[in-house]
């Protein structure tokens, strides 16, 4: 089983990236949020990986964060939700936000995500509420402080520049750890560099 890949980004596509590790290119399926957080091609990157083995294929699903991987693994335990569907769901909602919606039983919020109908949303709440409660608590009721403000401004700026919400959210999440004390224009430059790569 492959659990982690560290190498250089060779290519970025709509729903996957190719990671070059020692001259071997691994095709890794990624959510839009994780894909947006990757550096441009040629730059080093490390991804957490879930290896899905089928009779006729071996697929790799990658994650930029531990939270996204945890939610993905919980999602694929739900009847009727496979790895591809779980990845599509995580392209439409950030992992901690999904965990909060499930923990709060917010079926209306879940059905706004492409790929989640009412029955699936109810099943997610029923089957995952206990599993995701710790992650939902870690997310807290709201992001607070100056870091949250500058990240929200970054998201808004990216949306105004024409980027899709999952792209804006993904790159903002990727820059969260380095956002403290940095001005918006500095973060925006780095975000645009990542998105254009």
From Swiss-Prot:
Alphabetized Gene3D superfamilies for the sequence: 5' to 3' exonuclease, C-terminal subdomain, DNA helicase RuvA subunit, C-terminal domain, Nucleic acid-binding proteins
Pfam families attached to this UniProt entry: HHH_5, RuvA_C, RuvA_N
Domain of life: Bacteria
Keyword set includes DNA damage: yes
UniProt GO molecular function: ATP binding; four-way junction DNA binding; four-way junction helicase activity
Subcellular location field: Cytoplasm
Start and end residues of each stretch annotated as Flexible linker: 141-145
Family in the record: Belongs to the RuvA family.
Subunit structure: Homotetramer. Forms an RuvA(8)-RuvB(12)-Holliday junction (HJ) complex. HJ DNA is sandwiched between 2 RuvA tetramers; dsDNA enters through RuvA and exits via RuvB. An RuvB hexamer assembles on each DNA strand where it exits the tetramer. Each RuvB hexamer is contacted by two RuvA subunits (via domain III) on 2 adjacent RuvB subunits; this complex drives branch migration. In the full resolvosome a probable DNA-RuvA(4)-RuvB(12)-RuvC(2) complex forms which resolves the HJ.
Protein name listed in UniProt: Holliday junction branch migration complex subunit RuvA
The organism of origin for this protein: Anaeromyxobacter sp. (strain K)
